[in-house]
């Protein structure tokens, strides 16, 4: 089952959405300085811009589609100019269709300049944070908004702190296994539809649920199960990093399956290589316990660099080496 699908991305977000939501997820508060229709202004890029050169008159290559940040340098430059020069300098900025302007460090904009921005329909905000912190917070928020994402059919479970993505053909019991893991004390992130995001150029993948399905599960023969209502808040997770993919396969006696674990496999998810474990399914096999061991193996490798198959191989090699040294005597 291939997971290497092309990621999707938002084309833009409205300034209204940006203003209403950034304070809920990030440590920054914006205050409106004028009243314009923020729904008509859209942000198309995650990157921000400080328009120092544009204010001085050089507008070649001006990235006006970005959020414009006016810090101490820009506001003091405007304030030291005469009234006519100041208006001319600010016109070099507002004559372009910029999404919005953010003043940092509680800087003030002259009333005539604020009126110019309002006439052009440009929202102006102010924050008490410094330019450095404001740029970091706004960029991080826009990184989230413009991150690559894709929806996958499967189940996502937090097992011992390890994000395990269960995939496979319909009817193999992914939801039943996820439910069994929840009953054993682990946390459900998503079932049936798993939304996976890759933020910026990061190699980290975060999985979350579909907001409509939420933490409901469909179990064949039983119906819909509300995991949060049945098992409590401890049984659910909002977001989890994808650390391993467990693919459930129909048992095929003609197919050779991994027996030692020396041949490590991986699969690409949104361009990121993720460890892959393929598990054949047949009656009587306790997949839930195996998934727990898969998660524990990830922890062992991550924190102790320990792989059981390699440890066993090294032990066998040592026995053979000792055997050759003692001319046939078996060393235990």
Curated annotation (Swiss-Prot):
The keyword Zinc does not apply. One of its GO terms (molecular function) is protein serine/threonine kinase activity. Residues 280-285 are annotated as: Important for the catalytic mechanism of dephosphorylation. Disulfide bonds: none annotated. Mg(2+) binds at residues 175, 218. The active site is at residues 153, 174, 192, 259. CDD domains: HprK_C (cd01918). It catalyses: [HPr protein]-L-serine + ATP = [HPr protein]-O-phospho-L-serine + ADP + H(+); [HPr protein]-O-phospho-L-serine + phosphate + H(+) = [HPr protein]-L-serine + diphosphate. The Walker A ATP-binding motif also binds Pi and PPi. This is HPr kinase/phosphorylase. It comes from Chlorobium phaeovibrioides (strain DSM 265 / 1930) (Prosthecochloris vibrioformis (strain DSM 265)). The gene is hprK.
């Amino acid at each position: 089952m291939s997971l290497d699908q092309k990621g999707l991305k938002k084309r833009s977000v409205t300034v209204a959405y940006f203003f209403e939501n950034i304070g809920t997820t990030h440590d920054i508060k914006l205050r409106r300085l004028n009243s314009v229709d923020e729904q008509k202004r859209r942000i198309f890029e995650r990157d921000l811009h400080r328009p120092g050169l544009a204010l001085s008159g050089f507008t070649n290559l001006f990235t006006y589609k970005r959020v414009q940040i006016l810090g101490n340098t820009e506001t003091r430059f405007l304030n030291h100019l005469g009234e006519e020069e100041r208006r001319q300098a600010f016109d070099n900025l507002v004559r372009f269709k910029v999404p919005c302007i953010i003043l940092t460090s509680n800087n003030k904009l002259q009333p005539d300049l604020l009126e110019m921005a309002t006439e052009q329909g440009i929202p102006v905000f102010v924050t008490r944070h410094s330019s450095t912190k404001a740029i970091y917070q706004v960029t991080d928020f826009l990184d989230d908004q413009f991150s690559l994402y894709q929806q996958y059919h499967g189940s996502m479970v937090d097992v011992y702190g390890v994000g395990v993505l269960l995939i496979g053909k319909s009817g193999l019991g992914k939801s039943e296994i996820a439910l069994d893991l929840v009953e054993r004390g682990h946390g459900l992130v998503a079932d049936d539809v798993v939304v996976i995001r890759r933020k910026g150029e990061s190699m980290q993948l975060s999985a979350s649920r579909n907001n409509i399905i939420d933490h409901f599960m469909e179990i064949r023969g039983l119906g819909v199960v509300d995991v949060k209502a049945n098992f409590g808040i401890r049984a659910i997770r909002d977001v989890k990093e994808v650390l391993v993919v467990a693919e459930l396969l129909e048992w095929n006696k003609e197919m050779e399956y991994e027996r030692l674990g020396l041949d490590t496999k991986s699969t690409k998810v949104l361009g990121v290589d993720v460890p892959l474990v393929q598990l054949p399914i047949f009656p009587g096999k306790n997949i839930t316990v195996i998934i727990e061991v898969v998660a524990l193996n990830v922890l062992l490798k991550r924190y102790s660099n320990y792989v059981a198959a390699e440890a066993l191989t090294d032990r066998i090699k040592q026995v053979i080496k000792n055997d050759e040294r003692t001319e046939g005597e078996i060393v235990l």
